C-alpha cells in the first residue's frame, strides 16, 4: 500500500499564514494524497478548506512521527509476509557442483582429468513437503569416462511441516492486515492525538480564563466594599482585599501553566506566535475545530469488535500451532534411482571395451508414532533385490507424549475460557460506548447553547459599556464567560471526533454503517454561530 506525500515549499521559504489575528507557520504547504487512508477508519470528517484547524492538521501529518512510524511498520510487515509466502511456495536450486580440471602424467593426449557434478533441487513445503533432487556427475580421466544420473524424490503423507508453514503464513498475513488497517486508520489516529493536544490546550486555557473571571469578580467585590465605606482596618475590607490578592496569584499561576502548554503545542504543530496575536489564534482554532456528527452505534455489536475478532483469530492460530507441535505422527516415503555408465578406450590399437552399466533403485516408507518409529525399504542394487525393516520404541517417549497431550488439552480449555471472557467484556463495553455517545451529544449541545448565550451577553455588555451604563470590570466578566464557553465548545467538539475515531477503529464501522447525524439543537446553534462569526471576528 503506497502513500504519496507531496510537499510544496513556498517561494519565500518561511511564509506566515495569518487568520483573525493568529499566526500559523505555513512555510511548508502540504498536500497529502492517501488513497489507502481515505478518512482513516471510515468515519466522516467535515472540514473547511484553508482554516486554521486544517492547516495545523496537515502540518502535523507531514512533520509528525506517528504516520511515518505506521507507514514503516506496514512496509516491514509486507516484506515479512512476502518472504514467508515465498518460502511456503518452495525453492529451486541449480548448481554445477565441484568442477575439476587438471593435467597428469606430463604431456600427452590422455594427460588430463575433468570432473563435475551438475545438480537440480526442487523443494515445496506446501505440497507435502516434497523434495526432488537430480544429480548427474561426469568424470573423464584419460581413457575412462564415467557418467551417472541419480534421482531422489521424498514426500510426506502426514507431518507437521506443511501446517507449520501455513500457520506461519497466517500469522504474517494477520500482521500485514493489522498494519494495513493501522495505515488506513493513520490519518484519523494522527488527528486523534492532535485533538488530545487541543483538549489539553483549551483545558489549560479554560483554567486561565476561569482564574481571570474569579479575579474580576474579586475586584468587583472589593470595589463594592470600598464604595460602601468600609475602613481599611476593618475585617470585611481586609477580607475582600485578601481575596483579590489570592485571585491575582491564582491567575498568575494559571497563566504560567497555560503559557507552558501553549509553547509545547506551538512547537509541536508549527505555530509561529506572538503574545498580542495569541488570543486571536485561539479563537480561530476553537471555531475551526469541525462540528463532526457523532456516530450511531446501533449497528455495532459486541462480537464485531476488532479486539475480540483479533483475539479469536489469535486463539485459533495458537490452537492449530500447538496441535501441530504436539503431533507425534509422521509418515513419509522416498523413491530413488541411480543409473551409471562407464566407457573405457583401450590403447595399442585394441578395440574399446563395451560400456559397463550399474543401476540402483528402491523405495522407503517411514512412520513415526507415539514413542517410536519404523521404516520399510525395498531396493535393487546390481541385480540383487533386498528388503530392510526397522522398528524402534521407547516407553519413556510414550509417557512424554501422554503428558504433552494432557497439557495441550488444558491449554486449549484455558484459551477458550479467555476468549469467552473477552467476548463478555466486549458486550459490556458496547453498552458503555452507546451511553458515552449519547453523553457526548448532550454535553456538546449544552456547550453550544451556552456559547450562544454567552456571545449574546458579551455583545450586550459591550454595548452597555460603550454607552457608559456599566464599568470595564463588568464587561470583562462577560467576556471571560464567553471565552470560557468557547474553550468548552472546542473541547466538546474534539471529544466528539475522538469518540468517532475510537468507535470506528474499535468496531471497524464507517459512515455507511454509522448513520451519523447532527441533533436538531446543534444544527440550529451551528447555523446561528456561522452567521454571527464574521461579526465576532470584526469586533
Curated annotation (Swiss-Prot):
Keywords: Signal. It comes from the Bacteria. Residues 1-15 form the signal peptide. Belongs to the TP096X family. This is Uncharacterized protein TP_0969.
